[in-house]
Amino acid sequence: MAAPSEVAAIAPGEGDGGGGGFGSWLDGRLEALGVDRAVYGAYILGILQEEEEEEKLDALQGILSAFLEEDSLLNICKEIVERWSETQNVVTKVKKEDEVQAIATLIEKQAQIVVKPRMVSEEEKQRKAALLAQYADVTDEEDEADEKDDSGATTMNIGSDKLLFRNTNVEDVLNARKLERDSLRDESQRKKEQDKLQRERDKLAKQERKEKEKKRTQRGERKR
C-alpha cells in the first residue's frame, strides 16, 4: 500500500488521462532518461490506458529500447507500470466517490422538485372542499370519497413522475460520462498512432547512427 506522501504525489488531476501526479512524475522520469517527454509521454500514457496488463511491459520495452540499455530496460518499465497501478487505485476510488455524490445530489434535487405538485394539490383540495361546503352540493360521505380518490390519484401520479424523472436524469448523467470517456479514448488513440510513427523514425535514426559509427570504427582499424 502506498504511503500518504505517495498517495498525495499520485492524486488525480486534469488533462493527462490518469492523474496529474503521475503525468508530472513520468515527464521527470523520461527527461532524466534522455527521452523526449513531449513525444513519448502521451504515447506511454496511451499504452498504460489502453493495453491489457500483460501487454504493457512488452509495449513499454518496445518504446524505450531505443533509449535504454538492455540491462536496465526491464526494471525501468516495471517501475513505470507499478507507479501507474498505484495511481489508478487512487483515481478509481475518487471517481466512485464523485459518481455516488453526483447521483445523491441529483436525487436530492429531484425530491425537492416533486414536492411542489403535492403542495399545489393540497391547496386545490382545500378550495374544492370550501366550495362544496358553501353550496352543499354533495353529502359528507361523497365528499370524503372524492377526497380519498383525489389523494390516491395524486400520490400515484407523483410517484410515477418522480420515478421517471429520477431514472431519466441519472441515465443522462451516466451517458454524458460515457461520451466523455469515449471522446478521450479516441483522442488518445489518434495521438498513439502519431507517436508510433515518430518512434519508428527515432529508431531508424538510431540504427543509422550505429551503422555510421561501425563504419568509422572499421575504417580506423584498416588504417592502423
Curated annotation (Swiss-Prot):
Sequence ranges of Basic residues compositional bias: 212-224
Biased composition (Basic and acidic residues): 176-211
Region named Disordered: 138-157, 176-224
Keywords, alphabetical: Coiled coil, Isopeptide bond, Phosphoprotein, Ubl conjugation
Record field: transmembrane: none
InterPro entries assigned to the protein according to its UniProt record, in alphabetical order: CCDC43
Superkingdom: Eukaryota
Keyword Coiled coil found: yes
Annotated GO CC locations: cytosol
Composition bias type Acidic residues, residue spans: 138-149
Sequence position, cross-link Glycyl lysine isopeptide (Lys-Gly) (interchain with G-Cter in SUMO1): 95
Listed name of the protein: Coiled-coil domain-containing protein 43
